[in-house]
């Protein structure tokens, strides 16, 4: 069972989850552990889960550019700004903070090996603007042989 399955089982029974072009990334290409998971969890827990009405959507699309594999994680949730207001008094999560700390270490060894960007207001909807996370991974980095 994975992160999406658990969220569907507990909170988002009607979630529509789509993965596109997974075969673009070679099966022997190893990603840093948890990299995609943190972005997917944030999309579900802080975005999509706060929708009052469906549809509840999560899309992961894989692309191949010149030097990078691209992973786009798009949700139609409430967006990061509204989510931060809802979670204002709750404890601060460490998922993205830890991920960016890891990226800082990796990128200090290999220039621009991994980049993560977030884009808001993906959809033209006043209440459910959505968020897109874009992860860029250099083709040439072997993360398995990487020593911290």
What does each model-identified segment do?
Residues 124-148:
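C-terminal end segment of the histidine kinase catalytic
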Residues 1-119, 125-127, 136:
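Two-component histidine phosphotransfer core
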């Amino acid at each position: 069972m994975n992160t999406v399955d658990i969220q569907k089982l507990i909170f988002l029974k009607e979630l529509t989850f789509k993965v596109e072009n997974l075969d673009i990334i070679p099966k022997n290409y190893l990603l840093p552990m948890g990299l995609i998971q943190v972005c997917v969890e944030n999309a579900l827990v802080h975005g999509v889960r706060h929708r009052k009405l469906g549809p509840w959507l999560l899309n992961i699309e894989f692309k191949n550019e010149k030097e990078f594999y691209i992973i786009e994680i798009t949700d139609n949730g409430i967006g990061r700004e509204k989510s931060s207001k809802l979670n204002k008094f709750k404890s601060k999560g460490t998922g993205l903070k830890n991920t960016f700390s890891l990226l800082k270490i990796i990128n200090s060894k290999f220039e621009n090996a991994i980049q993560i960007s977030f884009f808001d207001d993906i959809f033209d909807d006043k209440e459910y603007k959505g968020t897109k996370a874009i992860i860029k991974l250099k083709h040439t980095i072997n993360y398995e042989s990487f020593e911290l």
